[in-house]
């Protein structure tokens, strides 16, 4: 059976997904970087130390939900936000691609300008803030990988 990993399981959405998959009796693991919770694995994506995932097997599933997501904080801390939300995420996706893992990258509605609502993959992105810009960059780069869903 393939394992599932929730990167950012200590966050609101990641935590909900982690609990849902656990309730289905799936082989699921979650990570945290700041908000330590029981049964989660410490993982700081900014450090680019992916050794805790060396035993990942082909077709294991990774849900990437780890990001700085407060637009006003990000506007004041662009370099740090860029490091996690873009550079470190892409390095991690590269690592997982070599392992032939399946990747589900959770983006954000912030890649759109909010003028329409109920967006689909066919809508034209138009981010209005730096957070949305970093998420859009990740989406564009992630599209080159074969085993990734956005």
Give residue ranges: language-model regions.
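Active-site YXXXK catalytic motif of short-chain dehydrogenase/reductase
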Residues: 85, 131, 135
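NAD(P)H-binding glycine-rich loop region in Rossmannoid oxidoreductase-like domains
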Residues: 45-84
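Hydrophobic positions on the long internal alpha-helix
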Residues: 88, 92-96, 142
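Conserved beta-loop-beta element that borders a ligand/cofactor-binding pocket
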Residues: 102-104, 108-110, 139-150
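Short, polar loop motifs at secondary-structure junctions
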Residues: 9, 28-37, 133
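N-terminal Rossmann NAD(P)H-binding glycine-rich loop of SDR-like oxidoreductase domains
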Residues: 3-24
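Active-site "gating" loop of Rossmann-like NAD(P)-dependent oxidoreductase/epimerase domains
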Residues: 68-72, 76-80, 108-129
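Rossmann-fold cofactor-recognition segment
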Residues: 33-50
């Amino acid at each position: 059976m393939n394992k599932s990993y929730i990167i950012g399981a200590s966050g609101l959405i990641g935590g909900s997904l982690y609990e849902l998959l656990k309730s289905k009796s799936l082989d699921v693991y979650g990570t945290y970087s700041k908000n330590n919770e029981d049964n989660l694995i410490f993982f700081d994506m900014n450090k680019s130390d992916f050794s805790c995932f060396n035993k990942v097997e082909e077709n294991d599933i990774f849900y990437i939900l780890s990001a700085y997501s407060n637009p006003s904080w990000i506007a004041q801390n662009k370099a740090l936000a860029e490091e996690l939300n873009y550079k470190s995420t892409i390095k991690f996706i590269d690592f997982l691609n070599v392992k032939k893992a399946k990747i589900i990258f959770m983006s954000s509605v912030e890649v759109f300008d909010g003028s329409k609502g109920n967006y689909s993959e066919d809508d034209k992105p138009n981010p209005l803030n730096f957070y949305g810009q970093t998420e859009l960059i990740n989406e564009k780069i992630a599209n080159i990988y074969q085993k990734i869903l956005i």
